[in-house]
Amino acid sequence: MPSPSAINEKVNILAEALPYIRRFHDKTIVIKYGGNAMIEEALKQGFARDVVLLKLVGMNPVIIHGGGPQIDHMLKRVGKEGVFIQGMRVTDAETMDIVEMVLGGLINKEIVNLINRHGGQAVGLTGKDGMFIRAKRMLIQDKEKAGEWINIGQVGEIEYIDPSLIALLDTRDFIPVIAPIGVGEDGESYNINADLVAGRLAETLKAEKLILMTNTPGVLDKNGNLLTGLTAGRVDELFADGTISGGMLPKIKSALDAVKNGVKSCHIIDGRVQHALLLEILTDEGVGTLIKGNG
């Protein structure tokens, strides 16, 4: 039989969670799922259970997943190396085929299966389903040559997200699991950064929270210390001095755009921590870095 102290600890945990369950009841929580949380078996199982729990207590989780390591692995199997410019994957036609196969097939269906096995009702989608994520080819400004732009292939810039398909799934209590693949007017597939899809989708759905799962404790300063809170102004300073770079760039851009366009809060959390999702949503202290506007 559990000791009185162990019982009290469990009661305190539930009591701490209760106000957050009330506050976020029937609210949309957009979660970008990526990093080690998608690779390590214990973390995968824990994530699926946590998502199902959020749904069971009345929240509406929407999952957007990445898959960079898995894509890199598949590219190496066919003799290709991944190339990145300003945090974006250069995507030629052959790479796009592999991206679509890995994201829309292998990874998406694995996540759906995990959630369903733990008692949820998940449905896997890409942005091509119902053409709900419209995109065009993205060009990146060349930092070394003023006024010039870099074509990085079939990398998409989001033009429009139609929320009606997600809303329909929500009315039937399904959990959407979305691979970040968009479609152009001509039917061409586009690889879109999952962080950017998550942010734009959070805006479109008027989400209460946007949560970005990473392989770091959050945003770190140059000494490796966690920055628990950031405003838009402070982020600009960190961009300027090079503290924020590489793969963190699209995450921060996504977070800033989201909070500027109506999302209540954005959190960058460590997906390597078991139950990080619940710790962020259902506890007083939360985890990771909170991004908010200047107001």
Curated annotation (Swiss-Prot):
EC annotation from Swiss-Prot or TrEMBL: 2.7.2.8
Pfam families, per the entry: AA_kinase
UniProtKB keywords: Amino-acid biosynthesis, Arginine biosynthesis, ATP-binding, Cytoplasm, Kinase, Nucleotide-binding, Transferase
Swiss-Prot/TrEMBL catalytic activity: N-acetyl-L-glutamate + ATP = N-acetyl-L-glutamyl 5-phosphate + ADP
Transition state stabilizer, annotated site positions: 32, 251
Pathway of action: Amino-acid biosynthesis; L-arginine biosynthesis; N(2)-acetyl-L-ornithine from L-glutamate: step 2/4
MF terms (GO), sorted A to Z: acetylglutamate kinase activity; ATP binding
UniProt-annotated binding residues for substrate: 67-68, 89, 191
One record GO biological process: arginine biosynthetic process via ornithine
Superkingdom, natural source: Bacteria
Coiled-coil features, chain-numbered ranges: none
Subcellular localization(s) per the UniProt record: Cytoplasm
InterPro entries found in the cross-reference section: AceGlu_kinase-like_sf (IPR036393), AcgluKinase_fam (IPR004662), ArgB (IPR037528), Asp/Glu/Uridylate_kinase (IPR001048), Glu/AcGlu_kinase (IPR001057), NAGK-C (IPR041727)
One GO CC term on file: cytoplasm
Top EC category: transferase
Family: Belongs to the acetylglutamate kinase family. ArgB subfamily.
Record function comment: Catalyzes the ATP-dependent phosphorylation of N-acetyl-L-glutamate.
Protein name: Acetylglutamate kinase
